[in-house]
Curated annotation (Swiss-Prot):
It is a multi-pass membrane protein. Its main location: membrane. SUPFAM superfamilies: Family A G protein-coupled receptor-like. Expressed in all tissues, but most abundantly in heart, placenta, kidney, and liver. Disulfide bonds: none annotated. It comes from Homo sapiens. Keywords: Cell membrane, G-protein coupled receptor, Glycoprotein, Membrane, Phosphoprotein, Receptor, Transducer, Transmembrane, Transmembrane helix. This is Sphingosine 1-phosphate receptor 3. It is found in: Cell membrane. Residues 327-357 are annotated as: Disordered. Receptor for the lysosphingolipid sphingosine 1-phosphate (S1P). S1P is a bioactive lysophospholipid that elicits diverse physiological effect on most types of cells and tissues. When expressed in rat HTC4 hepatoma cells, is capable of mediating S1P-induced cell proliferation and suppression of apoptosis.
Length: 378
């Protein structure tokens, strides 16, 4: 049984239910200790990583939205996956800001919302990868190029992804928890039932196995098919997208598998019997880093996405630089302007004769502005 805490570690205020569960699994004392300098730096680093995740996935969404080439089914799924990663970054950032001593100022409902948002992001990401695999498989079987006008299947699959994700994330707050059954409580998530965690891991594992089977079938279809695609460029682009998605799935499995295994250990272990469960934050960080790696994979593996991504970054930089360095034209003296205008009018025919091939005014501009507007002058 858990030992009583010394008076200096007793919380002054907080929720009794949360304290009871955290004390039962052995995590109460650690949450109430003052944060050391090293843990504070780690927290700041995690917050910076989360901000970077949100920023880069937001840029992926903007790049897909602004580029008409990406308005097809495949990139809609990639955009949905970027939205899931963005949500994961926000959810983990909120989780960090509400952790530590602040945990015990939360009600069980707010605690379930805090942790459930992470499960929603995980469920949406996993289901999005499954939806991409299903779409690719159906396309390869029919051997037809993407039809931008037929998007009902895309939105149906994306809608199903979010429905499943929100359902999984809402189950604990709807009653599948261990509020009245302490021996069934998870060590990593003290208010979650071990049965619920085992159920979620089973669902996610089944989805990942299905994804691997679908991509293996797609690979063998491509290798064994004797049918030729009429447009070589479309075929090459399709295979490039396939390679990109396979890399995304592989990285997802590599990043999330350690956390899945840790949850299985949590389900199997007796309370306070497995010290590794108290180091779960590092496994969670590895899983969250997957959301930061996906945009990097898009830009490195897809030439079109790389161009759109870097064009967006360059436009933002040039626009910001132009806003900071906008020149202010000095006012002209009226008398000088009159004399100069009269001189120009008297010599204007000569100038026109001497310079018949003068470049148009649109080309006489700052180089950065020209690049921004897409104007190239000879």
């Amino acid at each position: 049984m858990a030992t009583a805490l010394p008076p200096r570690l007793q919380p002054v205020r907080g929720n009794e239910t949360l304290r009871e569960h955290y004390q039962y699994v052995g995590k109460l004392a650690g949450r109430l200790k003052e944060a050391s300098e090293g843990s504070t730096l780690t927290t700041v680093l995690f917050l910076v990583i989360c901000s970077f995740i949100v920023l880069e996935n937001l840029m992926v969404l903007i790049a897909i939205w602004k580029n008409n080439k990406f308005h097809n089914r495949m990139y809609f799924f990639i955009g949905n996956l970027a939205l899931c990663d963005l949500l994961a970054g926000i959810a983990y950032k909120v989780n960090i800001l509400m952790s530590g001593k602040k945990t015990f100022s939360l009600s069980p409902t707010v605690w379930f919302l805090r942790e459930g948002s992470m499960f929603v992001a995980l469920g949406a990401s996993t289901c999005s990868l499954l939806a991409i695999a299903i779409e690719r498989h159906l396309t390869m079987i029919k051997m037809r190029p993407y039809d931008a006008n037929k998007r009902h299947r895309v939105f149906l699959l994306i809608g199903m992804c979010w429905l499943i994700a929100f359902t999984l994330g809402a189950l604990p707050i709807l009653g599948w928890n261990c509020l009245h059954n302490l021996p069934d409580c998870s060590t990593i998530l003290p208010l979650y039932s071990k049965k619920y965690i085992a159920f979620c891991i089973s669902i996610f594992t089944a989805i990942l196995v299905t994804i691997v089977i679908l991509y293996a079938r797609i690979y063998f279809l491509v290798k064994s098919s004797s049918r030729k695609v009429a447009n070589h460029n479309n075929s090459e682009r399709s295979m490039a997208l396939l390679r990109t998605v396979v890399i995304v799935v592989s990285v997802f499995i590599a990043c999330w598998s350690p956390l899945f295994i840790l949850f299985l250990i949590d389900v199997a272990c007796r309370v306070q019997a497995c010290p590794i469960l108290f180091k779960a934050q590092w496994f969670i960080v590895l899983a969250v880093l997957n959301s930061a790696m996906n945009p990097v994979i898009y830009t490195l593996a897809s030439k079109e996405m790389r161009r759109a991504f870097f064009r967006l970054v360059c436009n933002c930089l040039v626009r910001g630089r132009g806003a900071r360095a906008s020149p202010i034209q000095p006012a002209l003296d009226p008398s000088r302007s009159k004399s100069s205008s009269s001189n120009n009018s008297s010599h204007s025919p000569k100038v026109k004769e001497d310079l018949p091939h003068t470049a148009p005014s649109s080309c006489i501009m700052d180089k950065n502005a020209a690049l921004q507007n897409g104007i190239f002058c000879n």
